[in-house]
Amino acid sequence: MKTKKQGSNWTAYYDPDTGRYFAEIMYTSREGREQYDYEITQDVYSRLGTFSDDVDNERLIKTAKMTYSFENTMYGTLGPERTVWDEEAREAMRACEEKQTVKERKNKQKQTAKERNNKK
């Protein structure tokens, strides 16, 4: 199973070690930044990326349990600047993201080494 899916403003992760699914929606502009993290279900994860419009993917993600929000815009915050709804889920999502990043780096290094060997 694919462990990472991505759209314009969203990224979803599957952690095979824990069997959990997470998604992040992030908006950035000159006005500021907004970030929302969710713990999603396998059903939501499997449907992500099947829509022709990313807005539909974001709507699907928003049906899940929100675990974290961050809003910092030039218009002021819409509540507490940072709100952690579920600390354990947020930490699990960050660990999953880190695993994905390490995995992607290793794959990139392998690909680079393979390309160097092919040039010799």
Question: Language-model features: where?
Answer:
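A short, exposed loop/beta-hairpin motif centered on an aromatic-Gly-Thr core
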Residues: 34-46
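Long, compositionally biased stretches
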Residues: 1-30, 67-75
